Amino acid sequence: MKRNIPYIVLAAIIIGIIVAVKPWKNGRTSLEEGADTTAVQSGYYLPAEENASNQNVQVKTCIYMDNSGSMDGYVNLNSEFKDALGKIIVKSNNYSITTDLFFVNDAIYDVQQTALKGDVNNFVSQLNASNMKVGATGSSNINKIFKMVLDKTVNDTVSILFSDFVYSIKGTDVSSQVSNAKNATMGAFMDAIKRNPNFATIILQCSSQFQGKYYDRNDNPIPFVGTRPYYIFIMGSYDKLKYLDEKLALNNSNTGIPGLINKYLLSSKSWTLDENTAQALTTSYTNSLLIKPERNGFDIDFFKFDNSNSNWVFAYALGLSNLFVDGSYLTDINNYEVEPRDVSVIKAEYTKDPAALSEVTQFSSPLVLQFSTKRTVKTPNFKVRLLNKIPAWVSNADIPDDQGAVPSPKQTFAIGSLIAGVYEAFQSQTSGKPIFEFEVKINKYK
């Protein structure tokens, strides 16, 4: 018997090491605090709201302004464009280690080497169409600009690029040229993701007063006074963009950035929700007589139906403040998929319902997903996914050709293809994985 003791001790040590190294959490895969999250994540759990870890993020911000002739109209007057640019500069200067300004067209030009040198906080008050004429401003190649800016987006750097983002496409074969331009955009962003698997991007569509010349895809000038869209691309490491997203007040589509219309956030993250970020609601958003959750509040012990209803309606509250997704995307029910298809999402909203709020006090601003299924369907479990798609607003903002005409105030030539190029670069890393998913187990129905 004594001869077996060393083997028993050795086995106990091995088991102890396995238990210590592998994180266990109610049978689910967990992610250790501070662990590397740069790879595409699937099965890792979205951090609970109290576990935000972006308080001491070190950021060096570089702000680039496309100063080609097509941008003159935004600075010829005190416009929303100048207001937004000024606010981002001032806030960035407050929350970043350094904030540097550049003009960009055929090359990158440091503002401190121009007539606008000095305190960055005073940059916008001095900016006009004359003193920003640095470099080859006659036209711009947006893919060349992307490449130059992305090549400098390294380490602690976040790049913020202001432009109208209009492809210069000459000739009659518009479709194939746009396709080629989109592929070049995708290539530039794929290179950035290869250099930094933790790379992310925020796209803001903004609106501004405009007084100047609109240049169509052939670079033909059209005098125009009115409202035009422009875009802000914020690019860098995921944790640094999450930090600036909060500090620059970009947290949702109601941000204080003047003229903001839409927002799109892209990364290679894929998360799973658990009891720390999703809870069943029992007193609101339901027509059931009784819902009894499991002790964790996540899975369901049993449902008791009101048999007079043909459909059964129930809901989950989600705490998603650590999710890198705009609120407008989360409240679009077309972005969700439920398996099996007998269950569907019929409402997605940030709740103000007192009963719901009292059940999930741990969530600062709970998103409620309301589900519906036929009373006759009694599935033992169901899986919910937030799909990774291009937001609906992008196709609405796109116009396939602008030759000889100024598009409507919210439309930009080929912007849908440009953003699709960025999206497909990220999709090359995520392989179609959802932004998040969670699975609910139901023990029984009554």
Give, region by region, the residue ranges found by the protein language model.
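Extended non-globular C-terminal regions
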Residues: Q279-K446
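Eukaryote-biased recognition of electropositive, low-complexity segments
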Residues: R195-A315
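Extracytoplasmic/secreted cell-surface and envelope-processing proteins
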Residues: M71-V75, Y109-T114, Y167-V178, F210-D216, ...
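Von Willebrand factor
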Residues: S53-S163, Y167-S168, T201-I203
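Structural alpha-beta junctions
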Residues: V90-D100, N183-I202, K240
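Well-ordered, non-membrane alpha-helical segments in soluble/globular domains
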Residues: N76-I88, A129-K147, V174-A192
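Acidic, polar low-complexity linker/tail segments
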Residues: R3-L10, I14-C62, G69-V75, F436-K446
